[in-house]
Each structure stands twice: as structure tokens, then as C-alpha cells.
Amino acid sequence: MEHIRTTKVEQVKLLDRFSTNNKSLTGTLYLTATHLLFIDAHQKETWILHHHIASVEKLALTTSGCPLVIQCKNFRIVHFIVPRERDCHDIYNSLLQLSKQAKYEDLYAFSYNPKQNDTERLNGWQLIDLAAEYERMGVPNANWQLSDANREYKVCETYPRELYVPRTASRPVIVGSSNFRSKGRLPVLSYCQQGTEAAICRCSQPLSGFSARCLEDEHLLQAISKANPGNRYMYVVDTRPKLRMQSWWDTQKDIGRIIVRISSKIWNDEKIRESDEKKRLNAMANRAAGKGYENEDNYSNIRFQFVGIENIHVMRSSLQKLLEVNGSKGLSVNDFYSGLESSGWLRHIKAVLDAAIFLAKAIVVENASVLVHCSDGWDRTSQVCSLGSLLLDSYYRTMKGFMVLIEKDWISFGHKFSERCGHLDGDPKEVSPVFTQFLECVWHLTEQFPQAFEFNEAFLLQIHEHIHSCQFGNFLGNCQKEREELRLKEKTYSLWPFLLADKKKYLNPLYSSKSQRLTVLEPNTASFNFKFWRNMYHQFDRTLHPRQSVLNIIMNMNEQNKQLEEDVKDLEAKIKQCKSGILTKDLLHAVHPESPSLKTSLCLKEQSLLPVKDTLRAVEGSSPADNRYCDYTEEFSKSEPAVVSLEYGVARMTC
């Protein structure tokens, strides 16, 4: 609270950035230790978590007041007009401090209290068991074993304690390969295809320098290849663009030639002492020693494949360009699509999906194992491995399975959530929408295969909400070792049980578990299959959304059908009792009920599309009255909906 200078400002205006007639709402702005709260004249509340705030901008003073623009990590943008410049300045400075915490203990998760006891908290963390997940895949088995080499995080600090490696890989091979790979991230198992034992493995790039090689690393890759009895060759998939890597390799060769020439001159110069010669050569070698990719001459039975996904800096720039297009008011159709194309965002989404498709085809069609890496193996590698597994295994397309997939390929294998999401006040160049891209790829798959996923779009959006909210401990920290040091399981709560408690909200009414059980997804990545995810990037701009949702109507119809089936069963049971001769006055009335006695509505229009449930907030930071799943009946009767809201139920979902 020491950062809050002004706790309450009245007569603040909230503008609609897409309104054609500059409509606004007038209300009171509050600052709390965790939230910014705006209450309009109709007592409608808008909550914004401080951790969601990406940037705050105070614009030049106008005749109507001082503008304050807040951009959030969940792509919400709010534009306030504060009457007095002094109040605006105080709010601005407070938000700058509150949105950028210096240490983990100051994040919301460490103070959030859902009123659970320690046992309930522990049960929530134990909901996802990765050891059980590997057992589901049939591991350990004759070809794969659980290694304890990283039990104390001595082999690789950013990997989990439990690593699955080929049974023929000895401890010296594991340690030697780790020393040869960037950040010590050696090749380990991510996914094993049941029945064929073709595997998806992951690692970081090798420290190959000019011509360096590592026998232990070569032996480990050979062991991975032999662990697949169905195919003796394997793919090494480098997710980086080939042209950049070729340019890097050419540069290394040029530097190598220079070193050879210089070293030759040094050795021929008798005036230079031997110690100086060694120092200079070592210095030049250290400067030239780089990181690269595997030399096919040193690795037998591998096939090399580049898939061309750009780095975190390109992705951050691409998203920024996309958001600039989204925030532009009054763009023509041509200008919007031109800006969307110029951002390159959908092109990057396609590149990630194409890489995952290559993995799936290699395993299904060629029965070949695949080793995936990028630079350090925690960004592009996580994207490709998780999406490849999603295409191959229908379990990951269930709600529980998707949670397991995120825990396995993202959280346990050290995707740097806190750095990529900017949880703390750190280097802005480390922030990048890597996980957002993953969720968007999954959304595109749900659009192409609407019956294949148990969860709906709301589930993906809710997860995206909480990677930035810092309300739960799942996404805090950059690796498992760091999370253990923070004692997150003792001090914070897991997100997953809260999502499962509201499972009904996130169910896909089109899901067919029987037809999808053994299906491998084969998405089409032609350009016409990619579209702008409006419900992600404009989820809070309600004026841009249609009034009804086909999926919500289907969900209501399903609920009605279930209720009708229960009514039919009740009536059949009572009719059966009547036929057996047991007839009472109450039973007779039940067999011939009045029309209103049926539990289901005779007319769909009589019911709201989504019922209001105030028992649990869908997103922490919204009041029950402002829940995303609120009924819009009252709002629809107005000339124009409210400007900013956390809702998206009926008004968001489109067919």
C-alpha cells in the first residue's frame, strides 16, 4: 500500500476506443493493493489486476481532463479521463510501481486466499502426476528408463528431476552429453508413441564451435535411435530458420580460417614467448567458439530438418505490430488485412503448426523418432513438442490431458514463464508471446476439428488469463528448481482444480470422445485456414462482438435435452408403477402433470443463453456482477453495450 498515493478519484470517464460517437461512462476509480477498480453510475464494476498491466501512459492534458491509457497483457486496453492532472499523475506513478514487482514474494499468488486448508492445497498440486503420465505412455519399458542423474539438479538446473533416457545410456554418457549441450539441456524423452515406441525427444543446440564433437552426445543420439525398434534412423529437427543457421556456419568457417592464419604467424614468430602464444590462441578460440547444430558426418542414422520458426525477438515485434493494427480506429478492410499481413503473426503461427505436423507425420507415417531443439530448448522446442503430442494423442485433447501436456512440456521442462510473461521488473527483451502462440495454434486446431477437443475456446482464454495474472503458482518461476526454492506448493495454489471445478463452463458441446479416441489430427495449413482470433485480441471490446453465440445455444440445447431425458425416465418409472397397480393421488397427479411442471422450458427464448453463477469468479479481478459469463439480456436492450467488460459469454463466441 506504500505505493498508493491516491486511493479514490471521482468523476472519471471511461472511453470506448471503438465507439463512433465517443461514448463514455462516468464513475469512480479506486486503487487497492492488488486491483484497479472502476465503478460506473450504474454500479457496474470493472476490475483490472495490477499484474495484468503491461504499460501505463499519461497523455497530454485536454480540456476535459488528463487522459490515462492502460494496456494489459491479456490485450485489454482502457482509456480513462481523470478530471485533475494531479490525481492522474498520482494514479500513473502508483500503477507504474504496482505493476512491476521486484521479487516473487510480492506477487498476488502469495497473498491470494481461496479459503482452502493445507490438505486441499496439497491435493490441488497433486492433481497432475507426470510419473503417471509417462506410465500411461508405457514408460519405463525395455527401451526407456527413468534416470536419477538429475535428482539434485546437478546435470541440468532447468530440467526436471526425473529424466527419461534410453536404457542403454549410461551415466557418463548422460553427463557428457549435458556438457556438450547449451545450458546442459541434453536429449531426453518428451513423448513415446504407444505400440510403435517412436519417440519425441527434446534438447538444446550443441556447442559445436568450428568442428568440435562429443562422443557421449553421439552415443546418446544413437541410443535414442536404437530405442525405436521400428526404424533405425531418426530425425533431428532444428526449429530455427535454415538461412540464419547457414549464415552462422559460414561465419564460423571464416573466423576459423582467420584463426588458422593468425596462429600460423604466431608460431612462426620467434619473438613471442610460448605463454603469450597460448593466451592469444585461447582468447581467439573462446571468442570464436559458438553454438550450432549437429554435424551429420559425426552422427550416423540421422536426417536433418530445419522448420524455420523465428526467435523470441521477432515474435515480440510481430505481436506489437499486430496490436498496433488492432488498436487503430476506423481502418478500412484493406488497411486492416494489409496490417495483419505486415505483422507476420499468422505466418509465424503457420510455421509452428507446420513443425508440429512434421513431427506427427514422421512418427505415424515413417515410424521414426524425432529429436527437437532450438537454441536453448525452452521456447520453440516446447511449442513444437507439445503441439506434436497434441496431434498424435487424443488424451491431450481432453481437459485433464491438456493440463498434463502443459505441465510436462512447458512447466517441468523449464519454459521461462516469469521472464517471457514479464512477471517481475526484469529485462523487457526477454518478454515474448511464446505460450500465447501455442494457445493460438491450439485454437486453430479446435476450429479445424470442432469435435476433437473436449474443451472450448473459453478454456484456452482462461489459461491465457492466468499465465499473466500471477494469481496461482503454476506459471511462476522459470524452472522447477526455482519453483521448489520458492516453495510454491506450500505458499500458493494450483490453477488446475479451480478450472476443473468449473468444468461445465469449458466443455465443448460438439466433442465426441468415441470418434476421436484413436484419431491422429492432420490439419491443413493452407493460408485460407488461418484467421484472426478476435476473441483473444478483442475479448474486452464488447461493441465488436455479435449478440448471440451458436456454441452457447448448442450448450443450452444439450442441457435441455439432458433434462428432458431425466423427465422421460421419471415419467416412465411412474407409468410402470401405475401398470403394476400402485396408484395414489400424488402419483396420478405426477403422471398427468400440468404443463408448467416440466423442469425444462418449452421455449428456448425463455432462458438466458448462459446462467449467472456468482459462486466463483471466472477470472480473479472481476466481481461476480461483472463475470464474463453474465447474461447480456439487459445490456442488449440498450442502444449500445457497456464499453469495457470482463464478459464474453454470448457476445463473444461466434460460429
Curated annotation (Swiss-Prot):
**Which residues carry the post-translational modification Phosphoserine, per the record?**
595, 623, 645
UniProt modified residues of type Phosphotyrosine: 108
A GO cellular component annotation here is: ruffle membrane
Q: Does the keyword Chloroplast apply?
A: no
Q: Which residues does UniProt mark as catalytic?
A: 374 (phosphocysteine intermediate)
Top-rank taxon: Eukaryota
User: What regulation of activity is recorded for this protein?
Assistant: Allosterically activated by phosphatidylserine and/or phosphatidylinositol 4-phosphate (PtdIns(4)P), and phosphatidylinositol 5-phosphate (PtdIns(5)P). Interaction with MTMR9 increases catalytic activity towards phosphatidylinositol 3,5-bisphosphate.
Query: Coiled-coil region(s) at which residues?
Result: 547-581
Q: Tell what the record comments on domains.
A: The GRAM domain is required for cell membrane localization. The C-terminus domain (aa 540-655) mediates interaction with MTMR9.
Q: What is this protein called?
A: Phosphatidylinositol-3,5-bisphosphate 3-phosphatase MTMR6
